[in-house]
Curated annotation (Swiss-Prot):
Name this polypeptide is given: P2Y purinoceptor 2
Annotated stretches, region: Disordered: 318-377
Presence of keyword Cell cycle: no
Subcellular location, principal: membrane
Glycosylation sites: 9, 13
Amino acid sequence: MAADLGPWNDTINGTWDGDELGYRCRFNEDFKYVLLPVSYGVVCVPGLCLNAVALYIFLCRLKTWNASTTYMFHLAVSDALYAASLPLLVYYYARGDHWPFSTVLCKLVRFLFYTNLYCSILFLTCISVHRCLGVLRPLRSLRWGRARYARRVAGAVWVLVLACQAPVLYFVTTSARGGRVTCHDTSAPELFSRFVAYSSVMLGLLFAVPFAVILVCYVLMARRLLKPAYGTSGGLPRAKRKSVRTIAVVLAVFALCFLPFHVTRTLYYSFRSLDLSCHTLNAINMAYKVTRPLASANSCLDPVLYFLAGQRLVRFARDAKPPTGPSPATPARRRLGLRRSDRTDMQRIEDVLGSSEDSRRTESTPAGSENTKDIRL
């Protein structure tokens, strides 16, 4: 329950909102000191383990890289770094908003938290765009499906997010009060209006725009997959049903993890400057704190999603060792004098043409047939 205290007064009985510097309302946040340490701890351990396994597969088992695997690798790096930033926050909230470390480390932890959160969002966007091009324009996507282009895009994503999150190092600070040092995730009172403006820009640039792009991509893919093939009738083939379900799961996870967090955080920041009742502000504050673990859970769910979408990675993880023998077409390529990069491009073309042929077989197969092939997204 929140109570009016007057602007910039101290709090009573340890119920001061740890993210605020002398705000006019006093919030009862005892639930936060249980919810956040437990939820961050639950996310941290499996998040590190799952993404470590993913990175092992990418670095040690995967021999051929394309745009999709490149984006997934950087997504795994981002999620692993995000999970690695959680132990200090677990300790901080378990101690009741007491930060025994330096101000520099406080700034760094908050910076890593938001940097890797938004890197994950942008790499999910890159994967979605790549899949969309592969479904809608499979041949034209060959040029942009090369690993070297994906590496450039991934590098641009890291530079963009690091540049956008650099102001966090300026805004975030610590404050001592009643023998307790608080590591704020906002700013000092005199900078709060600027921080809200900055957060609004980041909301649009690093969440709203990527979310809209992902939504459009998956709607277009679903429309293409749900469109009946020429000369066929009956229900949707099993492969297409599976692909549509995968699309629905990706959208649901993205919306569940990121949308509530960003909506409640925007309301939390915006309404603090309005003359609202403390009861309303306390409800918004509680909603914001509850949605924080949802955003963190994405680092555990991402490995499951891209393993489901990339069945080739699952085979690499399952097999004792990756195939090393030459493909049947290798001697012919050697006779033609193709370089390694040319052979890679040839293989990519064959994969796409093979996928197109599989898609045509799928579309011509009656509903319920056991010969239906999976469509690669």
